[in-house]
Amino acid sequence: MSKLYLIIEKLQIYFQLILWFISFYWLDFELFPYLLEDSIFFKFALGMMMMSCQVFFYQYLYYTIKVDSVFEKENENELQNISEKHDYSTCKKCNILRPKRAHHCRYCNKCILEMDHHCFSLNKCIGKKNYHFFVRYLIFAELNASYIFWITIYVCINYYSELNKISFIKYGLMIFASFMGSCGLFLYLLFQLYLNLADLTTLEYIYPTLRINKNKQIHN
């Protein structure tokens, strides 16, 4: 794997960490102080929603990264009915017999069970064992972006007189960024939910030849 790819991969991870830090800082230190001036009920309800959203966001992010969907040679003994070859495929790169929906990731250089895609921003392959964590991570990432968008607008409208010119520019940029992020995450989440209902992975959607055919053996 080239050094350039490794550098780009690390930059993507650092960029993601910076975005997480900015969203956390903006919610907790820029917006929340304004909300403290509102009614106790509103403050408590909104504060609990914001905190819960962030807790679940980081929880599912952790599990998405921690849980591995790798299928390696030592896992071959887990396969049953080896004689039924149509249930399995052979990886030419790993030289192992694996479940048919497993695919070889050229970035991880490993076979991934029901591989959906390689997530560059998380530096992790999304597959059978961590896919549901990834979808939940997307849900709470979308909620976080939506909270930032709407609460920033709320603060701008209700505390107009307290904001100076620099604050307006800063808040305007955050409204634009959170709106774009929220829309992008929402569309991507809808796409993943569609794939889930259709029983497809991202790879199978992009490359129809990878879709399961019970009467053929697939090699890749």
Locate each region found by the language model.
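Membrane-associated feature with strongest affinity for ZDHHC
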Residues: 1-220
